[in-house]
Amino acid sequence: MSFPAMRNGVATFLMGAGLALGSGQTAHAQDSVTVKQFDDGGIYEGTFRNGRQHGTGTYRLPNGYEYTGDWIDGEIQGEGTARFPNGSIYSGQFLRGQPEGEGRIIFADGSQYEGDWVDGKITGQGVATYVDGSMYQGGFINAQKHGKGVLQRANGFVYDGDWLGGLEDGVAAITYPDGSIYEGTMSR
């Protein structure tokens, strides 16, 4: 199983949105809520320091993207929530405009992931739940199952073992819906 196509779009979209903003009219208020429109049609409503977004604020783009949360010196950093035009919602930590650290994304189809993010990508330990009732808990690299992990399907199938590039690969224990168990090595 894999995530919907949006899984790789998070980092690309965030970077493409120009979230470290510096153009537009100069804000004069410091630490007070100000509304500022940018050349790309984006609107920021929040606090500024030294003419840059700093503190908390909301940034909206004409395409439906919206970020609400922390800003440091014109960049999205800290805790926040990003809502994407396709209906996906990410809440968690950001660094340099990208998900970084702990975060949760709920995809438009209802599947979700909660766990570690690195450079805007699902990487590290986490839990993914899928619309078919399956759940995976374990390691990820670039949104693919990797390392140790447990996949449980709604029908009772359980794979507990090694993963490589999203595929079962290595030592594992498999419990089938009928209760039979296989322990051994899986290979591509």
What feature does the model see in each segment?
Residues 1-13:
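Bacterial N-terminal signal peptides that target proteins for export
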Residues 104, 110, 127, 133, ...:
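Intrinsic low-complexity tandem-repeat regions in disordered proteins
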